[in-house]
């Protein structure tokens, strides 16, 4: 392994490890030379003359291989007496000359860094050094590529295959080549000639390839967006590469197109080589004995996890029964990509049963529509031209009067339309969605009906009702009061429900925020206040004030203030009565309280009542002490005002 630059790399010389295999032609002469070398060594070690004469036969074997020049006295060297110093250098020189004739140096035609997609367990984009070579490559350099896909190494190859591998038939070997054909075929081609192969390694400083792309199986080169370009293969797969700049992209495209144009010549030339076929068979037997690597087995079975169990069958059927090794790579990449994005893998091919079940509901809906539409049209459209104008005139007012009975019909029509749309879009009737749609349609129908009723309410004219004395709470029977309260509460509930529907229809939120019940958000609306009838003014207070006008101003103010305080305690903050005051026993209209309109007239002695005594007492108390009486009968004032009597006050 060299760590020099691409331009300064030493020429890699092919050194196959199958050196002692007799089937290689280039190793036959080498084996003969090894035999000669072994024979020459004992000759040099023997010093006895008797042994030298007995072993004259091996000396004859050496004579025909290299004819010796006639020895003369001038040519003899005293140092040549020792045969060890002469025999070894000659054999090494012969080996080096033969290797120099047979070997072809590796030449780099193109090279540069490209971005590619990894074919490992974790998919990612990586930067690798790509290059193309001419000439054979050593097995030692291809050992790393072999380890990635198979167990064992190429360096420790046995000289002779085991008995089990020898007994294996050629048909079994061929079936094995179909499964691991691509990797072994690339290694066997690289040992003979690197033309038609695209290598890539981790960096420019290493000559050990980590991956090989077979350009003889490529079909075309397509330029992509940016600096990308794609290599399309016979099996339908593709390899996308990205250059660093547009110039390098153009050079790579031209070089790869030239290599693909010569693929037929290189393929025919390599297949004719006997060494290529022998190497491929030995690699197949070695791979069968060692087995695939763990990562390769994982890639082989991973498409069943990512694309389903039918992915492997479909890929093998589409390519004539042969397995496509690139399916595992793409399936692995898609599997991790879907796992990162949170998606579930979906099969491209659907079973025929699923197709049949999905097709049946669509056909039924189409047939129903095709049957129903003509019937409706035949019922509506007139058959003759004479009745045509009459029907058009009669249809128009019907369409205008339709909203009076429309909400129920509209709800049913919208429901049918929505159900039909769900069936046509999805292809299958969905019961749950239909139930939800029915509930929504019912809610909208109720809201439409409510709005329609509110809009069509007739405003009644204001009619003056006769003056009727309203009975107080004390005068009413308990049974009648209870029924009245229930009727008021029921009316208030109806009004509150209407108000709640209006708020729900307009989506107006009130105070109090929202609540969640089992995950559903519920709008919290303020409860409507109960409508309680309130009196604008207490009639008893007005009559009391009217009765106090007969007194002096100072006393009348004090009396009215006292009464007002007593009544004010019975009112709420909102002006509502807590209890009905004692002055409300009089049967008088609440809207227009009576005021004293009659002027006081002098009375006779016959018309005097006991009530005058109280007024006289009050007047005398005011005149003497100017103080407020402790006891006052308030019922006397309204009675006096109602009867219209005149009161005289003695000075």
Swiss-Prot record:
GO cellular component term, pick one: nucleolus
Bias (Polar residues) ranges: 410-429, 478-490
Composition skew (Basic and acidic residues), residue ranges: 1-12, 21-30, 90-102
SMART domains in the record: PH
Compositionally biased spans, kind Acidic residues: 72-83
MF terms (GO), sorted A to Z: lipid binding
Ranges of Low complexity composition bias in the record: 587-604
Biased composition (Basic residues): 497-514
Superkingdom of this protein's organism: Eukaryota
Keywords from the named record: Meiosis
Pfam families per UniProt: PH_6
Gene Ontology terms describing biological process: meiotic cell cycle
InterPro entries referenced in this protein's UniProt entry, alphabetically: Meu6 (IPR039712), Meu6_PH_dom (IPR039483), PH-like_dom_sf (IPR011993), PH_domain (IPR001849)
Location of the PH domain: 194-261
Protein's name in the database: Meiotic expression up-regulated protein 6
Organism in which the protein naturally occurs: Schizosaccharomyces pombe (strain 972 / ATCC 24843)
